[in-house]
Amino acid sequence: MPGKQLSDPCVDCSDAEAILTLRTRRLCQTCYARFVNFKVFKRMENYRLRRNMPKTGPCKLLLPLSCGISSSVLLHILNAQIQLELAKSHPSPGFDLHVLVIEPSSISHSSPSYDEGFGLLQQTFPLHSFTRIPLHSIFELDPELQEVISQFSKDGFVDDAGLSAKERLDAFRASIPTSTSKVDVDYVLITRLVVAFAKKIACRGVLWGDSDTRLAAKTLANVAKGRGSSLTWQVCDGMSPFGVEFNFPLRDLFKAEVDNYASFFPELTRIIIPDEPPSENVLTKNLSIDELMMRYVQTQGEKYPGVMANVTRTASKLQASLTPANVPQCSFCGAFMLNSGNNGGGDTTGASRALELCYACTRSRPELTC
């Protein structure tokens, strides 16, 4: 008996109707999801097989979950891969996954509390351990930050130790003047918090949920902000200046492909906090460099996906130069300051003697207006 005739068969399996076009190829949902999974699978191979690392003992990795689409998709994919590995009679050494949620409402007042979503997370992915902390817990996990922020803003901010941790951090963030500086400072704070937590629970590495689109935007934005020297760890897989490995398993996938994958699984829609749609009425001067670059990459990526992909591929080929042991690190963002003598960011008097800032962090200080 002849098989069922398909009007638009999947080019991979030929057994189901194609529903989406993936890089010029028409695929069904199953084959589309398999493609996305495989991209992440290859990126996680070193940890799965424990290449160049001990084969026995714990190998704990931290996944910071922003509750957005990309990091939620990464968690979903890794959970499925771990389940498949555990079902084998002779599984590979593998890794343990710990998920960190920084309470969204502690980062942005417009974000809702994640109480219900956090409970759903634990129910949906019971194999893994979860922790939820507010952004202001950075004072507890990274005590050195307290001295840094009191010196960072100079006259623009006075740290009051009598206030609660939340009030102190809110006051510091409010002292940052421009939209670009606010986004930049928040990114540094979140990174420091994630790294401090990863070290606390002895994680080998951090798995960031940045897609190719996001990494391309971050590359362009960091160069524009003077953070080009940090690209070797902010967009590349490998060791960070903090002594913890940074990896980006979604780096071979475009944002649109990640979005399509998320639409296949109803359980993801219940835990994802949707991104606010970009407003068309916002003046360009009121947008941060990061927002401008993300809009640019998303719009141009639809027209020229290969060009945008090359941005990330080129950046991933960058290699950190050998850093002498005596090279200082930026007191705020942690970047190595190879040209520290000329950045103008170091304070050399009184209690501020120890504060050294890289060029980009110096530009974010409130008193700098030009």
From Swiss-Prot:
Chief location bin: cytoplasm
Keyword Iron: no
Compartment(s): Cytoplasm
Known pathway: tRNA modification; 5-methoxycarbonylmethyl-2-thiouridine-tRNA biosynthesis
Cellular compartments per GO CC: cytosol
Annotated organism of origin: Neosartorya fischeri (strain ATCC 1020 / DSM 3700 / CBS 544.65 / FGSC A1164 / JCM 1740 / NRRL 181 / WB 181) (Aspergillus fischerianus)
Protein's name in the database: Cytoplasmic tRNA 2-thiolation protein 2
UniProt KW keywords: Cytoplasm, tRNA processing
Source species, domain of life: Eukaryota
Upper lineage: Eukaryota, Fungi, Dikarya, Ascomycota, Pezizomycotina
Cysteine pairings via disulfide bonds: none
Role: Plays a central role in 2-thiolation of mcm(5)S(2)U at tRNA wobble positions of tRNA(Lys), tRNA(Glu) and tRNA(Gln). May act by forming a heterodimer with ncs6 that ligates sulfur from thiocarboxylated urm1 onto the uridine of tRNAs at wobble position. Prior mcm(5) tRNA modification by the elongator complex is required for 2-thiolation. May also be involved in protein urmylation.
Family per similarity comment: Belongs to the CTU2/NCS2 family.
GO molecular function: nucleotidyltransferase activity; sulfurtransferase activity; tRNA binding
Matching InterPro entries: CTU2 (IPR019407), Rossmann-like_a/b/a_fold (IPR014729)
GO biological process, one term: tRNA wobble position uridine thiolation
